[in-house]
Design a protein with these regions (language model features):
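Membrane-embedded alpha-helical segments of integral membrane proteins
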Residues: 20-82
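Active-site recognition of the HExxH zinc-binding catalytic motif
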Residues: 58, 235-256, 260-261
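Transmembrane alpha-helices and immediately adjacent membrane-cytoplasm interface residues
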Residues: 74-78, 92-126
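Membrane-interface segments at or immediately adjacent to transmembrane helices
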Residues: 117-187
């Protein structure tokens, strides 16, 4: 045993260092004041610095790192297999390889916990705004759903459509507008005021679709990244959602709420449509589970072109239903829950409570 430790001293020190960071994170996460300081005075400014640095590049650095990580993983696998085959002491060689892989894994876990995981234990948007997702009444749910349907119909009159009657827009123009979409919220929520970095489109967007993702925030580069292949009608609200993560907001329900609020208040027609659409989809899904007849009545009041957009969106995502999407979403759900968010990915549906309480 001593020989194993001595022969792999560097790897063991690396392991202990990662373990110490994770233990320290576990012990400190219950101290709200300490976590708030760490998040809002250390990691958030650091991620904003990274975001500004990466903004100078026309491509997603996050996507490049994912590709490099995948290539590196394949190369390391080949090298380790070769090392194991050539080694005379198979057991020691296997131990060294396993220790190296464990070190890499724990390094990523420790870095992610410090840069992003800590945000789950800091004051969130609801804490800082005094808004909370209180339970809502059936009457309020119906009223707010109708309110969103009416405004969605109005917003639909101001956007462009293609020859098939579907929403159409220049996707790059949507991305270019994104860094101003939150300006309309600063008076009401001054703590949201910060310089935004425009979201970046992902080159391998079809892979994102297969994984059932429309966007993601990458704390190691401070970049918001969006799917450029999924239906364009919700691209603007996806941009706004991911920009909320640049502000350290981890809760998906709060990010969706802010996306709706920012999009519907800004002065861009494409963002207005996406905001009312996102809100209507969440509210409509909630109402359908409670009263399908009431949902149908509101759905029937929508103009045909909006129904066409909704059907196109459903058809697009239906083609990607399968094992990949299921596994990816399950892993994402477990990751979110591991940081104390008991709702996991179901917290996406809790945006309804925030919307109804705010608009009722």
């Amino acid at each position: 045993m001593k020989t194993l430790y001595r022969d792999n001293k560097g790897l063991h020190h690396w392991l202990f260092a990662c373990g110490a960071v994770l233990v320290l994170f576990y012990l400190i996460r219950g101290n709200r004041a300490a976590v708030n300081f760490w998040v809002y005075s250390v990691t958030l400014p650091f991620e904003q610095f990274l975001g500004r640095a990466c903004a100078a590049l026309p491509f997603s650095v996050a996507e490049l790192l994912y590709v490099l990580a995948a290539v590196t993983a394949v190369v390391l696998l080949v090298l380790m297999v070769r090392y194991l085959i050539k080694s005379r002491q198979k057991g020691r060689a296997a131990y060294r390889c396993a220790l190296f892989v464990l070190d890499l894994f724990l390094t990523v876990c420790a870095a992610f916990s410090l840069l992003w995981g800590a945000n789950y234990y800091a004051d969130d948007f609801c804490d800082r705004s005094d808004l909370s997702p209180e339970p809502v009444t059936y009457e309020d749910l119906v009223r707010v759903t109708q309110y969103f349907a009416d405004h969605l119909a109005e917003a639909s009159m101001h956007i462009a459509r293609d020859e098939n009657g579907l929403f159409t827009a220049d996707r790059q123009e949507i991305l270019n507008y994104a860094d101003t979409v939150y300006d309309c919220l600063y008076d009401e929520f001054p703590f949201l005021d910060m310089p935004d970095q425009k979201p970046k489109g992902i080159f391998f967007s079809k892979i994102m679709s297969a994984m059932n993702f429309t966007g993601f925030y990458f704390p190691f580069t401070g970049e918001s990244n969006v799917n450029m292949d999924s239906p364009a009608m919700l691209l603007a609200s996806t941009c706004a959602h991911e920009l909320s993560h640049q502000r350290g907001i981890t809760s998906e329900q709060q990010s969706n709420f802010l996306a709706v609020l920012a999009c519907t208040r800004c002065d861009d027609a494409n963002y207005n449509y996406a905001g009312w659409m996102l809100g209507y989809i969440h509210l409509g899904n909630a109402l359908y589970r409670v009263d399908p007849d009431a949902w149908q009545q509101i759905r029937d009041s929508l103009p045909d072109e909006i129904v066409l957009d909704l059907r196109y969106n459903s058809a697009y995502w239906a083609q990607y239903k399968g094992l990949t999407a299921t596994v990816t979403q399950s892993l994402n759900d477990k990751m979110i829950k591991s940081y104390g968010d008991e709702l996991g990915t179901q917290s996406y549906g809790a945006v309804v409570d925030l919307l109804v309480n705010y608009y009722a």
